Amino acid sequence: MKILFLDQSGKPGGAELCLLDIARKYRDRCLVCLFSDGDFRTLLEANQIPVKVLATPLGISKDSSFLIGLLSTGQLIPLMLKVARLSRQYDLIYANTQKALVVGALASVLSRRPLVYHLHDILSPEHFSPTNQRIAVTLANRFAAVVIANSQASQSAFIAAGGQAKLSQVVYNGFNPSLYQAAMSQRQPIRQEFGFTPQEFVVGHFSRLAPWKGQHLLIEALTHCPRSVSAILVGAALFGEEDYVQQLKQQVKDLNLEHRVRFLGFRSDVADLMAACDLVVHTSTAPEPFGRVIIEAMLCGTPVVAAAAGGAMELVEHGVTGWLVKPGDPLKLATIIQHCYDRPNLTIEIAKQAQIHASQSFDLGEIDRQLAQILLQVREHPNGANSTND
């Protein structure tokens, strides 16, 4: 099966890392088209996955108005025509983001190729403007053969926004457990590299630096924890959120935490860094569609605390495979960090259970098989659920 993958971003976020894992299986019979250049192209090339950058970024943000969307049509139409021409060489179009859905839906009409939409977002007011919610739902309902949701939370939000339930199927992100378990051997070298003492309890936060990711909550929580508890913030600002980084650094300075908080920026050795931590925290203030870092931490054998909202609640069983904390509450977060700090044996045992759970439930091989079956059905029945709409 030949697949044309579409993604709007040149920067590797969660949706892009998921696409990387999927495309790797089809690398000898696929093409990944990006709407902007960046590190994601380099990452695809490093994995021998064919990639082509088609255009500069479309000028539509998650909260943009319909007028701004219309103004971008000068870019949209040429891009759609390029994709339509390319897609005639492939069996199906696989749109991995919302802007890719817009382009892919129009291109699929011209090329008569079935469209698959991989939904990595929660279509809610916290994440999208009402206009963009309507655009996504309308295009998916009308043109997609199937909507692959990355969690039950994403699927439920799609249906609540008007999406057809019969179109959607939930397929979680897949992971290669061996890649993360190998990182455990790097725990001591990494801790030595950063000068962590044996007594230091290191809390890791892994995501792009953005207000809704909640790094400021972890920084505030540290003020309620023992002085031997420190934090590393791994990730960089994307999408024009550099001001938030300065706010975080000022917060650290104002709270006299300069010696307890390290900003590491973007790192490619995330698994090694996770394995070096005593705890990984996920602090998103809005519901997370999935939460890859949660599963990655589990696979590394590192205990994890996650915000109790969205897809994260499907990944963590409180007190069994990790801990859930009320979003936006630094005091509750500090309480759980203290709990893990005071009970190392219990924390390690829970981390072991989580590692087993993640290895069994999110194995990339099994996820690949689920996706392959769905894509085969799309190729054999290209109209999918939409066959009843014609």
Where are these regions (language model features)?
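N-terminal strand-loop element at the rim of the active site
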Residues: 5-13, 23-73, 154-157, 239
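A conserved mid-protein helix/loop that constitutes part of the nucleotide-sugar donor-binding site
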Residues: 13-21, 201, 208-224, 243-246, ...
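Acidic donor-binding loop of glycosyltransferase active sites
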Residues: 91, 260, 275-289, 302-303
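Short His-centered aromatic/hydrophobic patch
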Residues: 95-101, 119
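Acidic anion/phosphate-binding donor-loop and adjacent secondary structure
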Residues: 128, 156-160, 166-167, 174-193, ...
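Active-site donor-binding acidic/aromatic loop of nucleotide-activated sugar
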Residues: 240-245, 258-267, 273, 323-324
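Short hydrophobic beta-strand element within catalytic cores of glycosyltransferases
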Residues: 303-306, 316
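Conserved acidic donor-binding segment of nucleotide-sugar-dependent glycosyltransferases
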Residues: 317-319, 323-330, 339-345
